[in-house]
């Protein structure tokens, strides 16, 4: 069971999709095919040279 969280570009809702069951990525609320992976809220620190 591989579950991933995506954000719909059209309606803005967060959607949990089980990738082991389906390969069709669509928003179940509005039917949009454009989904984004949300970025983590933790800021990254990059060491400057």
UniProtKB/Swiss-Prot annotation:
Could you give the cofactor binding note from the entry? Answer: Binds 1 zinc ion.
**Binding sites annotated in the UniProt record for Zn(2+):** 11, 27, 30
The Gene Ontology terms for molecular function here are: DNA binding; DNA-directed RNA polymerase activity; zinc ion binding
Could you say which cofactors this protein requires?
Zn(2+)
- Matching InterPro entries, A to Z? RNAP_P/RPABC4 (IPR006591), RPABC4/Spt4 (IPR029040), Rpo12 (IPR023464)
Which is one Pfam family of this protein? Zn_ribbon_RPAB4
Main function: DNA-dependent RNA polymerase (RNAP) catalyzes the transcription of DNA into RNA using the four ribonucleoside triphosphates as substrates.
**Family in the record:** Belongs to the archaeal Rpo12/eukaryotic RPC10 RNA polymerase subunit family.
Q: What is this protein called?
A: DNA-directed RNA polymerase subunit Rpo12
Task: Name the species this protein comes from.
Answer: Pyrococcus abyssi (strain GE5 / Orsay)
């Amino acid at each position: 069971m591989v579950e991933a969280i995506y954000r719909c570009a059209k309606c803005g809702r967060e959607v949990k999709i089980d990738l082991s069951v389906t390969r069709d990525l669509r928003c179940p609320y509005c039917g949009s095919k454009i989904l984004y992976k949300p970025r983590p809220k933790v800021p990254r620190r990059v060491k400057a040279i």
